[in-house]
């Protein structure tokens, strides 16, 4: 972990998230900020043709499933949440409460690098609200509002 640059490598991510192959959707955190004004995180997911779901989605024209873009965004949100409150206790997770206003703007294909930007908005009654944006080469792929609860 490089705290000076506020980055996390895969080993750091594995300490925070319970997900493992083939469902770990964050490869690296390239930046996070935990100031009073804002709490944000930028992560990347390298989309490889070797991902198992490309065998069926779709064999003639592989497309990264939209639900997995949202999952990647949610995992980035989980990392941000744990960076805000510290390393999780054993068995402690952030669970999805809702995804709202999800919009998909273009397909993601093998070879793309998905950039995930998430931002903490607020917490109310134990439910935290975040916003997320996914881009490829600076082009908007997906945006959504995510809510989660720590359990």
From Swiss-Prot:
<dbReference type="GO" id="GO:0016020">
    <property type="term" value="C:membrane"/>
</dbReference>
<keyword id="KW-0441">Lipid A biosynthesis</keyword>
<dbReference type="InterPro" id="IPR010084">
    <property type="entry name" value="FabZ"/>
</dbReference>
<dbReference type="GO" id="GO:0005737">
    <property type="term" value="C:cytoplasm"/>
</dbReference>
<dbReference type="GO" id="GO:0009245">
    <property type="term" value="P:lipid A biosynthetic process"/>
</dbReference>
<dbReference type="InterPro" id="IPR029069">
    <property type="entry name" value="HotDog_dom_sf"/>
</dbReference>
<dbReference type="GO" id="GO:0019171">
    <property type="term" value="F:(3R)-hydroxyacyl-[acyl-carrier-protein] dehydratase activity"/>
</dbReference>
<feature type="active site">
    <location>
        <position position="57"/>
    </location>
</feature>
<protein>
    <recommendedName>
        <fullName>3-hydroxyacyl-[acyl-carrier-protein] dehydratase FabZ</fullName>
        <ecNumber>4.2.1.59</ecNumber>
    </recommendedName>
</protein>
<comment type="similarity">
    <text>Belongs to the thioester dehydratase family. FabZ subfamily.</text>
</comment>
<keyword id="KW-0456">Lyase</keyword>
<dbReference type="GO" id="GO:0006633">
    <property type="term" value="P:fatty acid biosynthetic process"/>
</dbReference>
<dbReference type="InterPro" id="IPR013114">
    <property type="entry name" value="FabA_FabZ"/>
</dbReference>
<comment type="function">
    <text>Involved in unsaturated fatty acids biosynthesis. Catalyzes the dehydration of short chain beta-hydroxyacyl-ACPs and long chain saturated and unsaturated beta-hydroxyacyl-ACPs.</text>
</comment>
<keyword id="KW-0963">Cytoplasm</keyword>
<keyword id="KW-0444">Lipid biosynthesis</keyword>
<dbReference type="Pfam" id="PF07977">
    <property type="entry name" value="FabA"/>
</dbReference>
<keyword id="KW-0443">Lipid metabolism</keyword>
């Amino acid at each position: 972990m490089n705290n000076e640059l506020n980055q996390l490598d895969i080993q750091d991510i594995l300490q925070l998230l319970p997900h493992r192959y083939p469902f770990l959707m964050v490869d690296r955190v390239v930046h996070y900020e935990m100031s009073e004004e804002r709490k944000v995180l930028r992560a990347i997911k390298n989309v490889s043709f070797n991902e198992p779901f490309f065998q069926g989605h779709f064999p003639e024209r592989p497309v990264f499933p939209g639900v997995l873009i949202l999952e990647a965004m949610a995992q980035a949100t989980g990392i941000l949440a744990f960076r805000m409150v510290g390393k999780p206790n054993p068995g402690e997770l952030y669970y999805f409460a809702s995804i709202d206003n999800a919009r998909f703007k273009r397909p993601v294909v093998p070879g793309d690098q998905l950039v995930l930007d998430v931002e903490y908005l607020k917490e109310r009654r134990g439910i935290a609200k975040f916003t997320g944006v996914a881009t490829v080469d600076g082009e908007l792929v997906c945006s959504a509002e995510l809510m989660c609860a720590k359990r």
